[in-house]
From Swiss-Prot:
It comes from Bos taurus. InterPro entries: aa-tRNA-synth_I_CS, Arg-tRNA-ligase, Arg-tRNA-synth_N_sf, ArgRS_core, DALR_anticod-bd, Rossmann-like_a/b/a_fold, tRNAsynth_Ia_anticodon-bd. It is found in: Mitochondrion membrane. L-arginine binds at residues 133-135, 144, 322, 326, 350. The modification N6-acetyllysine is found at residue 568. Keywords: Acetylation, Aminoacyl-tRNA synthetase, ATP-binding, Ligase, Membrane, Mitochondrion, Nucleotide-binding, Protein biosynthesis, Transit peptide. One of its GO terms (biological process) is arginyl-tRNA aminoacylation. It comes from the Eukaryota. This is Probable arginine--tRNA ligase, mitochondrial. Pfam families: DALR_1, tRNA-synt_1d.
Length: 578
């Protein structure tokens, strides 16, 4: 990608440096655009060439760059060669740049940037992504929103790159909280409320029974006994648990549909209640299980009895724990999917838990444990609705839709829409996702309702507005101009800046594929939208000569296509009117 320009430059460099072109491809990068000056299209970092050089004298980088530039020649692709601070810079023939980039964007469609030489030679893998994973007995809160949208982004990106992706929602549907919930429902539950609003009612019951159990030992004892009945397979207890689970999943699926998220498998800790006992037996047979004075069973991760480096895998009554069930799930998934990579997306508070799980798998002799990866994220602070603290994710989604509808109604330029509620939801979700994805995933961030709905500046609303405006341009002028175009009509600085930015899309996708951070794509799309806004103001289509109008429509169509591609990877549905 970068339309073959990178490979053409690498071929010339390989002859001078006596290195295979493949070794040079990733050292040649598209230059970020600059508002201050016109920049070259590509640059080679001389420092990157010297990284593997064993010559400790390492001559001055600038001298090396100049010597290399002198050996290179302009050709039909490269029109100018210069040097920068430790770099050799390449300017592409302007008309070739224009024609090739725009043709490539239109021809490749949703695959633009993904066919790049940066990705060539990378094997297609089987990848499992576990994300969202709410606890059935507890509130489906905003932390699960982060896991949901981050996991969805990672799965989207891996799928777009041609990998075979399995999306798993691993529900917290087992454990002591179900002892509390079963007892609590028998004491405080109402069947009508459970049927009409399962997540809300189960949460209310869970809060109430926790208070009772703290004050009344008999309630705590009943809860413990109920969970033991579950573990032993008591039919009556399991029937009540199954009802809680089924009703909750139905409501989750409705919420996921609003988010535009889907899963290939709804799994859960309950699937591994028996297999976790097999894991305990396996640990015991390998001499890894140690009993404590309290009757619990632990695995020593230090190898020398360090009490601070143990992981508890069994309660004193023989019931399993979260870690045990995660071990059983990992082993089962390897048998089922034979994955090359398994990614867990949870908050950073679970970092130690996953370190221990991966370490135990290694100790058990499973070499594939190194293929398991935890992608942690920080906490969202300050996300409250007008009624106060947020309890449920659905409250947030409803608030977003309501506020966006009010915003749209107050703006004079808002178009008449067939389904204003659906548009408001899509724009609102874009606003939420962009605010979340702008920084490092690991960072905590302060949520701001005011900032999230700004139509100007670096927001999701601005991205949606840009996409809708460009779509409107195509609708207004139709596709009659788009049969062919004159490259000489797109040589203004505004056009060239957009073309240079479009060149960089594959590098941005590559960076995000390496570190799984969506911020690279977010930053790229925001810059693209700002460039499009400037071009829209200065490069008029209306009242321009047909040849000029057609060329500009080609440019704006390419921008909209790449903008839509990037938004979809992030989990955003682009709107065509707003």
């Amino acid at each position: 990608m970068a339309c073959g320009f990178r490979r053409s430059i690498a071929s010339q460099l390989s002859r001078v440096l006596d290195l295979p072109p493949e070794n040079l491809i990733k050292s040649i990068s598209a230059v970020p655009i600059s508002r201050k000056e016109e920049v070259a299209d590509f640059q080679l970092s001389v420092d990157s060439l010297l990284e593997n050089n064993n010559d400790h004298s390492r001559p001055d980088i600038q001298i090396q760059a100049m010597r290399l530039a002198e050996k290179l020649k302009c050709d039909t692709v490269v029109s100018e060669i210069s040097t920068g601070q430790g770099t050799v810079n390449f300017k592409i023939n302007r008309e070739l740049l224009t024609k090739t980039v725009l043709q490539q964007v239109i021809e490749d469609g949703s695959k633009y940037g993904l066919k790049s030489e940066l990705f060539s030679g990378l094997p297609k893998k089987r990848i499992v992504v576990e994300f969202s994973s709410p606890n059935v007995a507890k509130k489906f809160h905003v932390g699960h929103l982060r896991s949901t949208i981050i996991g969805n982004f990672i799965a989207n990106l891996k799928e777009a790159l041609g990998h075979q992706v399995t999306r798993i929602n691993y529900l917290g549907d087992w454990g002591m909280q179900f002892g509390l919930l079963g007892t609590g429902f028998q004491l405080f539950g109402y069947e009508e409320k459970l049927q009409s609003s399962p997540l809300q009612h189960l949460f209310e019951v869970y809060v109430q029974v926790n208070k009772e159990a703290a004050d009344d030992k008999n309630v705590a004892k009943s809860a413990h006994e109920f969970f033991q009945r579950l573990e032993l397979g008591d039919m009556q207890a399991l029937a009540l648990w199954q009802k809680f689970r089924d009703l909750s999943i139905d409501e989750y699926m409705r919420i996921y549909q609003r988010l535009g998220v889907h899963f290939d498998e709804y799994s859960g800790e309950s699937f591994y209640r028996e297999k976790s006992q097999e894991v305990l037996k396996l640990l015991d047979s390998k001499g890894l299980l140690q009993k404590t004075l309290k009757g619990t069973a632990v695995v020593d991760l230090s190898g020398n009895g360090d009490p601070s480096s143990v992981c508890t895998v069994m309660r004193s009554d023989g019931t399993s724990l979260y870690a045990t069930r995660d071990l059983a799930a990992a082993i089962d998934r390897m048998e089922k999917y034979n994955f090359d990579k398994m990614i867990y997306v949870t908050d950073k508070g679970q970092k130690k838990h996953f370190q221990q799980v991966f370490q135990i798998l290694q100790i058990m002799g499973y070499d594939w444990a190194e293929r398991c990866q935890h992608v942690p994220f920080g906490v969202v602070q300050g996300m409250k609705t007008r009624r106060g603290d947020v309890t449920f994710l659905e409250d947030v989604l409803n608030e977003i839709r309501l506020r966006m509808l009010q915003n749209m109604a107050s703006i004079k330029t808002t178009k008449e829409l067939e389904n204003p509620e659906e548009t408001a939801e899509q724009v609102g979700l874009a606003a939420l996702i962009i605010q979340d994805f702008r920084g490092f995933l690991l960072s905590d961030y302060q949520f701001s309702w005011d900032r999230v709905f700004q139509s100007r500046g670096d927001t999701g609303v601005f991205l949606q507005y840009t996409h809708a405006r460009l779509h409107s341009l195509e609708e207004t002028f139709g596709c009659g101009y788009l049969n062919d175009f004159n490259t000489a009509c797109l040589q203004e600085p505004q056009s060239v800046s957009i073309l240079q930015h479009l060149l960089r899309f594959d590098e941005v996708l590559y960076r995000s594929s390496q570190d799984l951070q969506p911020r690279h794509i977010v930053s790229y799309l925001l810059t693209l939208s700002h460039l499009a806004a400037v071009a829209h103001r200065t490069l008029h289509v209306r009242n321009s000569p047909p040849e000029v109008a057609g060329a500009r429509l080609h440019l704006f169509r390419a921008v909209r296509s790449v903008l839509a591609n990037g938004m979809k990877l992030l989990g955003i549905t682009p709107v065509c009117r707003m």
